[in-house]
């Protein structure tokens, strides 16, 4: 990021940890003087058919995906609400990552699909709640080929299809949703 002229700060907190999420948001505000957006993109897989899934596998996926979306958003939302109530202009954005698996389902992913569908609902409701404070909330549902999805059979796709699933096609959408150009877009999945 710095090599490309940007600024960045590392943070090793767990997005699903309440205090860690608060520390993450506070670190961004203290480092950069403000917070204008967050992107929730943490994820894990613990795939198993429903009859074989353990409680720990269910809980781990729900914790990272759903609580890991909620906790940072909650602390950022409180910051933006306080700014708006103080009369300051807020033009902020939350972009969450859901999945086509959460929308259409995928065998062996009841935990993952439930978490991702939960993120979709969270996005729509949070958008309605936060719009009055100048905050947009949207989600992307990529079908990208990553290290995490290679083992799901996506790695078996043709080279042409693999090229189309490259994550580089998702970043411009997320960047646009974080920009002022998308100021009239909220509550979209």
Model-derived regions, located:
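Substrate-binding pocket helix/loop in short-chain dehydrogenase/reductase
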Residues: 49-50, 57-62
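Active-site helix of classical SDR
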Residues: 73, 115
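A glycine-rich helix->loop->beta "capping" turn
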Residues: 4-7, 27-40, 46, 89, ...
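Active-site-adjacent segment of SDR/Rossmann-fold oxidoreductases
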Residues: 4, 104, 120, 125-135, ...
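The beta1-alpha1 cofactor-binding region of Rossmann-like NAD(H)/NADP(H)-dependent oxidoreductases
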Residues: 12-23, 55
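C-terminal helical subdomain
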Residues: 139, 159-189
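Residue(s) in the substrate-gating loop at a strand-loop-helix junction
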Residues: 99
């Amino acid at each position: 990021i710095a090599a490309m002229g940007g600024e960045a700060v590392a943070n090793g907190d767990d997005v699903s940890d309440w205090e860690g999420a608060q520390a993450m948001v506070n670190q961004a505000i203290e480092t950069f003087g403000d917070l204008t957006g967050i992107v929730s993109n943490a994820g894990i897989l613990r795939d198993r058919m429903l009859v074989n899934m353990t409680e720990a596998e269910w809980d781990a996926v729900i914790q990272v995906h759903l609580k890991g979306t909620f906790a940072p958003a909650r602390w950022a939302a409180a910051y933006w609400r306080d700014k708006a109530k103080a009369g300051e202009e807020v033009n902020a954005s939350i972009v969450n990552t859901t999945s086509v698996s959460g929308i259409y389902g995928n065998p062996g992913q009841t935990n993952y699909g439930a978490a991702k569908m939960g993120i979709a609902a969270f996005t729509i409701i949070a958008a309605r709640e936060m719009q009055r404070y100048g905050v947009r909330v949207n989600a992307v549902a990529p079908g990208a080929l990553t290290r995490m999805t290679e083992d799901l059979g996506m790695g078996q796709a043709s080279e042409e299809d693999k090229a189309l699933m490259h994550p580089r096609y998702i970043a411009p959408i997320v960047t646009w949703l974080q920009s002022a150009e998308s100021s009239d877009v909220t509550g979209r999945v």
